[in-house]
């Protein structure tokens, strides 16, 4: 039986008021065709335009950026998988098709200076063009839809507008294009039936040429009347968020100057906003822009957290660092964005906000400078932007991506990101317990299980274990958000995502419901609590390995009685000379510099399924050089992103390994885990090695322990990595005690609860539980969800039976 002791009279600190929030990034068609419910794909006809400086290859299937990063393109249709799975037929203008009409992009006759092309259509009599939307144009009986377009022609041209499928017309309207310059034409439709995959058609009875500069088809009913998809925004509201981070994410950085996110390109009339290619494999119209994000935050009652570009493209995609002029321009763009949000209505950018319908300033409390940026190039840019911003807006809370590598970065909050396996998050429950309280506060801005059990219940419970760690450390962990947030089910760039939808339906993965439980049951103060819980050991398996500093020599490696040879090098190559192996360090240009030592690694043999065994080798000890041996090394499963990345991905690269290493350094022996940063899992033990000679090293893995021997003497027995089977945290208010209990084991676990106050016998339990692989789908949207249970039997001392793989929130009423 586990045990939880709660001392409500010992208030540790107030809860962090903004702890649980949202992170929006336009990924997997989260914007156009998603939260921004534009129904016409490629509404400005620009999807097939290559970003400046990029060159197509593979017959147009991919392009290469100016710095060498590869993206899937397919003439603007995006990922190869989308084209295949969605059965996209070839067309010169993505999403648009013609029947008895000729289409071409016109680069000269454009609607305004921000539009790069128009669609020139020569209709034969009775010809038409049609748009297939985001795998169909959705229709729902009785619902209203609004259409508008900018068009021009040399003569009066009557056009028929229809929403149809296989000859069935769901709505129709007429538009008469007047001769002369560009003009806007509007129409309204009332759906005469329901469909998921209709098409929008523009037909012409005459033989004539028409130019189309911009088109749009949107539902009339939107969230609070502000233009966003209602069911998706309601799901955001119902998760009880306190803030929203936007607009990214990697799209803030882009992979070239053209693909960088600039505030100025996302405000004003939507037909005047330049589109731009996102590094998530498609072009965004920027209809969902800075104003719309701020308005959504206001409508949800959450505080905005704006992420600005710091002056570079994505460091994980062959970065380009802005020159002095470009950097100054970016600083100006950031200041203009802040003026748009916060400035008076008579300021330059505040006046545009007022013209957009919001005279009063928006609320904006947080500014994050950069996304996942680091190193010297980041540090000086961060300091430059921070100084400029705080001189004008001193109330802003400044968030950094990194704590500094060549110098300490002074910021209010530092943003940490984690993507990993379920066990990582269960073990991470204690990660912030030892966090330096003098360091910046913490924003866990992106985290999720994206390797094994993605989008399933076991992942949700593992993430909840991690969140228990946030609950316990709210004096330093101030903000947290899951990532990514949205995915159109037909356009996945990443998996998992919190909320998934097609054109008419939406559902949430199990994680959504654990967030709803945590975000809806906050309390007022974090109170003292202790727990006694069982542990679960990692299922460790793999190969022995040689490691240590560059040039360390080994000889005669033997695994389970048989000699073994080098099989692969990670940041290393093996130089073999007879029975000797020297570990030679290799540089990896894609490996960032870390403020800690990362040892090269040479694996031995091929049996990745081995879980126990004896490894022996001789190691030459040279003063000042570390010797290290890898214990059962194997790569983690690749995430969906890494499996589908057009840039080749080696599963044996260091970032996919979490190696346990026996390290002999400076006269001590210890075992450490490579978890970036490495952490010791054993106490350092003194050890004596013969200098300038070979020393015999041996480790034996048996059960949950590894025994270490040097020159025939056992020097230590170390317990292999484990994680707690359960995590608990407690908060209270004047009237209630709130207990969060997460059981990550596959067995029910009784919990003995000891309180220092009287409570009513009746209490409630918010519960999420099920089987490890349980998940939701469009046809079973709530196969996994939380329930509210009325329970009884509470008191100063009582027992709660935590179901296997469960998240429980107990609310007790004080008496």
Locate the predicted segments by residue:
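Aromatic- and acidic-residue-enriched carbohydrate-binding clefts of CAZyme catalytic domains
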Residues: 22, 53-118, 252-290, 317-332, ...
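Short carbohydrate-recognition loop motifs
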Residues: 106-127, 573-601
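Extended acidic/polar, glycine-enriched regions
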Residues: 126-238
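Short, aromatic/His-centered strand-loop micro-motif at the edge of beta-sheets
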Residues: 173, 672-698
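Catalytic-core region of carbohydrate-active enzymes that cleave or remodel glycosidic bonds
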Residues: 296, 386-401, 413, 417-522, ...
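Secretory/extracellular carbohydrate-interaction modules
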Residues: 547, 590-670
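Carbohydrate-binding surfaces in secreted/extracellular proteins
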Residues: 557, 617, 691-719
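Carbohydrate-binding surface patches
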Residues: 724-759, 765-770, 808-811
């Amino acid at each position: 039986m586990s045990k939880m002791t709660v001392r409500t009279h010992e208030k540790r600190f107030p809860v962090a008021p903004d702890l649980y929030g949202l992170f929006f990034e336009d990924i997997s068609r989260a914007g156009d065709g998603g939260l921004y419910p534009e129904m016409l794909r490629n509404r400005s006809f620009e999807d097939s335009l290559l970003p400046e400086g990029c060159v197509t290859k593979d017959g147009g299937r991919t392009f290469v950026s100016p710095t060498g990063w590869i993206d899937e393109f397919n003439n603007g249709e995006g990922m190869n998988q989308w084209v295949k799975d969605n059965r996209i037929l070839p067309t010169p203008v993505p999403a648009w098709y013609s029947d008895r009409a000729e289409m071409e992009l016109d680069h000269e006759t454009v609607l305004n200076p921000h539009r790069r092309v128009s669609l020139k259509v020569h209709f034969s009599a009775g010809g038409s063009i049609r748009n297939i939307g985001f795998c169909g144009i959705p229709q729902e009986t009785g619902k209203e839809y609004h259409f508008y377009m900018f068009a021009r022609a040399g003569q009066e041209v009557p056009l028929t507008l229809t929403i149809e499928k296989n000859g069935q017309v769901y709505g129709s309207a007429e538009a008469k294009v007047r001769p002369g310059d560009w003009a806007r034409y509007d129409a309204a439709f009332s759906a005469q039936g329901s469909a998921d995959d209709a098409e929008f058609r523009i037909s012409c009875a005459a033989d004539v040429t028409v130019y189309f500069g911009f088109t749009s088809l949107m539902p009339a009913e939107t969230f609070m009347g502000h233009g966003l998809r209602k069911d998706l925004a309601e799901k955001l509201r119902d998760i009880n968020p306190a803030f929203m981070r936007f607009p990214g994410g990697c799209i803030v950085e882009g992979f070239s100057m053209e693909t960088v996110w600039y505030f100025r390109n996302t405000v004003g009339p939507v037909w005047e906003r330049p589109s731009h290619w996102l590094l998530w494999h498609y072009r965004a119209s920027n209809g969902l822009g800075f104003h719309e994000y701020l308005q959504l935050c206001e409508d949800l009652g959450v505080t905005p957290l704006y992420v600005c570009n710091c002056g570079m493209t994505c460091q994980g995609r062959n970065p380009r660092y802005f020159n002095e002029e470009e950097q100054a321009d970016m600083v100006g763009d950031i200041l203009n964005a802040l003026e748009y949000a916060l400035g008076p209505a008579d300021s330059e950018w505040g006046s545009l906000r007022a013209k957009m319908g919001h005279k009063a300033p928006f609320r904006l409390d947080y500014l994050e400078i950069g996304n996942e940026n680091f190193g010297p190039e980041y540090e000086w840019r961060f300091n430059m932007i921070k100084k400029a911003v705080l001189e004008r807006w001193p109330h802003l809370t400044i968030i950094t991506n990194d704590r500094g590598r060549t110098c300490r970065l002074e910021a209010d909050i530092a943003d940490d990101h984690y993507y990993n396996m379920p066990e990582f998050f269960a073990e991470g429950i204690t990660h912030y317990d030892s966090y330096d309280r003098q360091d910046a506060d913490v924003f866990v801005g992106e985290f999720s299980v994206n390797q094994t059990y993605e989008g399933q219940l076991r992942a949700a419970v593992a993430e909840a274990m991690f969140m228990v760690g946030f609950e316990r450390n709210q004096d330093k962990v101030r903000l947290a958000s899951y990532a990514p947030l949205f995915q159109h089910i037909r356009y996945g760039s990443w998996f998992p995502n919190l909320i998934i939808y097609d054109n008419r339906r939406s559902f949430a993965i199990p994680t959504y419901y654990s967030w709803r439980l945590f975000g809806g049951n906050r309390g007022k103060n974090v109170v003292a609590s202790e727990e006694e819980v069982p542990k679960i050991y990692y299922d460790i398996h793999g190969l022995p390995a040689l490691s240590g500093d560059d040039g360390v020599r080994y000889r005669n490696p033997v695994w389970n009685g048989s000699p073994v040879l080098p099989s692969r090098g990670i940041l290393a190559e093996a130089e073999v000379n007879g029975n000797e192996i020297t570990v030679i360090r290799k540089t990896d240009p894609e490996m960032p510099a870390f403020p800690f030592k990362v040892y090269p690694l040479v694996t031995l043999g091929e049996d990745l399924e081995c879980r126990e065994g004896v490894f022996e080798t001789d190691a030459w000890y040279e003063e000042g050089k570390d010797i290290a041996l890898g214990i059962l090394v194997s790569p983690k499963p690749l995430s969906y992103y890494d499996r589908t990345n057009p840039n080749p991905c080696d599963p044996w690269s260091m970032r996919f390994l979490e190696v346990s290493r026996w390290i002999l350094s400076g006269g001590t022996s210890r075992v450490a885990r490579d978890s970036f940063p490495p952490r010791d899992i054993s106490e350092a033990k003194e050890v004596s090695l013969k200098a300038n000679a070979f020393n015999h090293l041996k480790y034996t893995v048996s059960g949950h322990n590894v025994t270490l021997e040097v020159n025939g003497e056992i020097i230590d027995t170390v317990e292999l990595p484990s994680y707690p089977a359960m995590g608990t945290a407690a908060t209270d208010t004047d009237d209630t005690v709130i207990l969060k209990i997460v059981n990550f084991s596959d067995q029910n676990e009784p919990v003995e609860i000891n309180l220092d106050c009287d409570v009513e016998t009746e209490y409630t339990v918010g519960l999420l539980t099920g089987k490890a692989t349980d998940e939701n789908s469009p046809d079973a949207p709530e196969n996994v969800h939380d329930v509210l249970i009325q329970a009884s039997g509470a008191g100063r001392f009582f027992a709660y039976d935590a179901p296997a793989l469960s998240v429980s929130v107990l609310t007790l009423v004080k008496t």
